[in-house]
Amino acid sequence: MKTKMTALLAMSALVVVPAMAENEGHGNGSEANKPQGFRFFNNRLTIKPYVSLSYTYDSNIDTTHKATSDSIFLVSPGADFTWRGDRWELAGSLWYRYNAYCDYSDTMGENSYGESLTYKWTNVDNASGKGWNLLLAERYAMINQSDSLTANDGRGIWRDRQKVDVSGVLERRFTDRWHMDVQGQYNWLDYKNDTGKYAPLYGWSQYAAGLQAGYAASKWTDLLIAGGYSDYTQKRGKGYRNYSNDSEVWTVQAGLGTHATEKITYRVLAGASWLDYGGHSNADSGWTYSLSANWRMTRQFQLSALGSSYYQPSERSLGQAIKVSSLGLGASYLTLGDKMRLHADISYRHEEIVYNDRYLGHGNNFDEDLLSVRIGADYTLNRWMTVFANIDWQEDWCDDYKQYDYDRFRGTVGVRFHY
């Protein structure tokens, strides 16, 4: 679906907003305190390895109303790389995370790992504005039960899972004002289920395609219109014979964006989506939106926003579809000679049941809200070491099912060694 696809591509840019401020030159002496990495091919290829060590206190490790607490020690090695050409750039990351639970190591997951790649290419002529832009991205992650909405692609659901995202955008700029792009995406989500311990969760595979056209009336105003189609294939389960495992979503949206500004970028689309769930046509329809924005107010201070709404099959029940609405706001500030970065973000996610089979969805027919707030700081001691700390508050509430409500507090301190 176009809304979700656009949000995922925009997220790759917005998530790194604080990192952009940290990694750029900010005056005399700042370069000496930043990781330089290993450089090859006349500095076109840069590889930056790192190892993070941290301690976390978690007040609710399994995100339930019962609220069982534990302490967690984490070791996370990884590496980031960037390879630049004259008109292209290839960037990627590889990471591993080991969680050692003090009291519940026999039941809680320990290993998470993943990788990501992004390729950008352009031949747009600066004078005429004509040419092509290409963006390709992929990522894989195996994430253990330690789940947070504000970090590591968290979904607010406690369960081991694997996720694959592959996406691409090809844009044609006809002039410095007129442009059009086609988009494609594949997603795969799979949960590890042990029905002897807990109720199953259901993943899917998804194919999506979209088309967007725009006219840049000015650098502040890019008029946009977009349409998209998405097909979900949900994992089957017992009692699912009355439904096809395929669901379809159509989306039409229009809105505004920016074209060539440096300090302020935004993209806001709104429109309508239609859901056909499990072979049942016209299961639901409604308005949807997509939002991404970044405002670099000063060299040190930045604000960002990211949000979207979309339809999808439910993850907690068969015979059920939901509409997800989400919004995240973030801020980042550099101080102490650019050695310290202060950051804060707030994320909200609402899941509304829009289709429910009374038999298959029994006990799961409730809307759910998840709110997460995080504040943190990191301080670069030198080019080899950074210390960091953050606190994370998460609250979940479910309409008419108060036994599923929970809140969660996490506090983390750690050190990151880098080169």
Located regions from the model:
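Gram-negative and organellar
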Residues: 21-419
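Cleavable N-terminal export/targeting peptides
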Residues: 1-31
